[in-house]
Every structure is written in structure tokens, then in C-alpha cells.
Swiss-Prot record:
InterPro entries: Ribosomal_uS7, Ribosomal_uS7_bac/org-type, Ribosomal_uS7_CS, Ribosomal_uS7_dom, Ribosomal_uS7_dom_sf
Entry protein name: Small ribosomal subunit protein uS7
Superkingdom as given in the UniProt entry: Bacteria
GO terms for biological process, alphabetical: translation
Protein role: One of the primary rRNA binding proteins, it binds directly to 16S rRNA where it nucleates assembly of the head domain of the 30S subunit. Is located at the subunit interface close to the decoding center, probably blocks exit of the E-site tRNA.
MF GO annotations: rRNA binding; structural constituent of ribosome; tRNA binding
Assembly, per entry: Part of the 30S ribosomal subunit. Contacts proteins S9 and S11.
Organism: Mycoplasmopsis synoviae (strain 53) (Mycoplasma synoviae)
Similarity annotation: Belongs to the universal ribosomal protein uS7 family.
GO cellular component, one term: small ribosomal subunit
Amino acid sequence: MSRKKSAKVREVLADPIFNSVVVTKLINTIMLDGKKSIAQDILYSAFDLVKEKTKKDPMQVFTQAVENITPQLEIRTRRIGGTNYQVPTEVSKRRKQALSLRWLVQYARLRNDKSMDLRLANEIIDAANKTGGAIKKREDTHKMAEANKAFAHFRW
């Protein structure tokens, strides 16, 4: 174990339009090479597309999508007696949010739509409707945890 102090968790400021910390975290997840203004443009135009397609408040659709993607369990590899076990563990609140936003952006990038804002909008809508790649990832993670439930007693 490291003897250094653990790094302090910095406060993330809420974004100016939706006044939400989660939206800022999503912008930071979308951002590549430090180009935050481009990431903001992508997200805000994606929210406009969500509003156009669903006729609902994009923030509500987004929070529903994140809620549907959020994992409860995950698999951690633990080495005991020369054998690696896949141990299911509960996910902390911060990691739940980070994973859900990461999966949302990851599977939006893998889509075949024309632009990133369209891909992201479609992935958010799909996640809110409990379909799409990010939901499948969550289900696969939960299935793996369920399959390895026998090793749950190896927890940290």
C-alpha cells in the first residue's frame, strides 16, 4: 500500500445551463484533449435532440437514463492461494455514477449515427427506455456477479 495521503476529491461545479453537477461530469467524460467547449456543444445539442424526439424535458430523460444504467454490483478479481477468483462486490456511490456516465459515452461513441450529438441523444433515449449498449453492459455486469455469487465470501 502507498504511504502517501490519498488525493483529495475536488468539487465539480454545476454547469451553467442545467445547473447540475452530473451534467458537468458527463461533459468531462465526453471531453477529449481538454476541449471542454466542444464537449459542451455536443451535450447541449444532444439534449436539444432528446427534447425534439421525446417531447419531454431532456434533464428528466437523462436522469432516468443514468438511473437505468447505474450498476449495483461489479466483479473484482482477487487472488487467493494461486487461484484468481471473480468476486462480486457492491459499487460505491461515486463509482456507480462514474461507471454509468462512462458507459453512456462509450456506447454512444460505438454507434453508427452521423454525429456525436446524435449518437449521444439516441443512447440517452435508449437508456431511458431500458435498451441500448449501456443497458446491455449493466446487465452483463450483473449476470457475471450473479454467476460468481459463490465467491462472495472472499470479500475484502
